[in-house]
């Protein structure tokens, strides 16, 4: 569902899927082909939130406080992305937390359950793991391609949901 807040309503691009029980609130922009899955919350109630093209915000994830999400990004189930910048072609693993001022550069993976502390910047092609999160190694070309493939699979899945989902 989309909600206006303080006179600001979400801006939604073409071919966007928003699950019925997801909440997209206030000053939010969703790029073409993006998807917001069941139970997710994108709260643009205090600052603008940007979600790029063909990005997916998976079940029960939360975006808040000026988060900027690039193109082709996967934000995994139950992740929290707060006041940070996630560049293009990044996978934020399930249950991970990325805090204010952090920057995750393109072609990177933040592993499941990682805690990215505030104001940390990570270089491109990083495998970022742990609590607190650190770079463990550079990603391979195959791993980078798998990030792209995951985002594309969610674009396809969102199209299927838009065509075939029936509310009972």
Language-model regions: role of each:
Residues 10, 14-18, 22, 28, ...:
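A structural motif detector for beta-strand N-caps
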């Amino acid at each position: 569902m989309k909600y206006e807040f303080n006179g600001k309503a979400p801006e939604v691009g073409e071919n966007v899927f928003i699950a019925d029980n997801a909440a997209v609130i206030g000053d939010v922009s969703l790029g073409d082909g993006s998807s917001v899955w069941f139970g997710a919350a994108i709260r643009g109630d205090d600052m603008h939130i940007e979600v790029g093209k063909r990005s997916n915000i998976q079940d029960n994830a939360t975006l808040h406080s000026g988060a900027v999400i690039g193109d082709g990004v996967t934000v995994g189930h139950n992740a929290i992305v707060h006041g940070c910048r996630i560049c293009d072609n990044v996978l934020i693993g399930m249950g991970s937390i990325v805090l204010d001022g952090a920057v995750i550069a393109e072609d990177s993976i933040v592993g499941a359950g990682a805690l990215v502390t505030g104001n940390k910047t990570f270089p491109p092609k990083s495998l970022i793991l742990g609590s607190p999160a650190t770079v463990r190694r550079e990603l391979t070309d195959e791993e980078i391609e798998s990030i792209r493939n995951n985002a594309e699979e969610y674009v396809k899945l969102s199209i299927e949901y838009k065509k075939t989902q029936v509310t009972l």
